[in-house]
Amino acid sequence: MSRTVFCQRLKKEGPGLDFQLYPGELGKRIFDNISKEAWTEWQKKQVMLINEKKLNMMNLEHRQLLEKEMVNYLFEAGEVAIDGYTPPSK
């Protein structure tokens, strides 16, 4: 049986993550408050950020930037700004 969480990003109930995907207190916060759907959305944004900004995950500053963007996206209802990207219209 999957667990349900109230997703802080989507502001609705949904299936929670199966396990903690990120270490530490932030990982626990994500596990307890973010749904699978919101996490999948974040992963797509994360890939775009890494590619467009040419981030190197071996570089501490780049990891910190990505973490800051993740917190902003998941918990502060922020959007990820990617230069030159226009989301498809619905």
UniProtKB/Swiss-Prot annotation:
Record keywords, A-Z: Iron
GO MF, one example: iron ion binding
Biological process, per Gene Ontology: cellular response to oxidative stress
One cellular component (GO) term of this entry: cytosol
InterPro entries cross-referenced by the UniProt entry: Fe_traffick_prot_YggX, Fe_traffick_prot_YggX_sf
This protein's record includes keyword Nucleus: no
Biological role: Could be a mediator in iron transactions between iron acquisition and iron-requiring processes, such as synthesis and/or repair of Fe-S clusters in biosynthetic enzymes.
Similarity remark: Belongs to the Fe(2+)-trafficking protein family.
Record's protein name: Probable Fe(2+)-trafficking protein
Organism (species): Aeromonas hydrophila subsp. hydrophila (strain ATCC 7966 / DSM 30187 / BCRC 13018 / CCUG 14551 / JCM 1027 / KCTC 2358 / NCIMB 9240 / NCTC 8049)
